[in-house]
């Protein structure tokens, strides 16, 4: 993210959180912002993000006119707002959460093993296990001990 608008020592994520806190406080909406309600609203907004892509052949950027791009930008802002508010309500540091999750993803999806392969982890892992079983069966048939 672009850091030049955030005050010294504060991230833009912190600025967004504070802006959202103020918006909610001014409207006395915090009583409605339970983690469950925020997660539900996040899901709704994420679904609304799909609407401008409906019925497009591929959904590539070249198919999106300015009106659709504005709608997408606004829905992305809604998704981000609810994500930041949900994280705030649960005391989740989104930066740290992303670092933690990326470490897990790197272990789960090693680049040399999955490059160019869009299958889910369980699918390629199952294929690897099947290949291992087939190799073991071949070795057994050839008289090798496992």
Where are these regions (language model features)?
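Flexible "arm" and connector segments at domain edges
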Residues: 1-76, 80-146
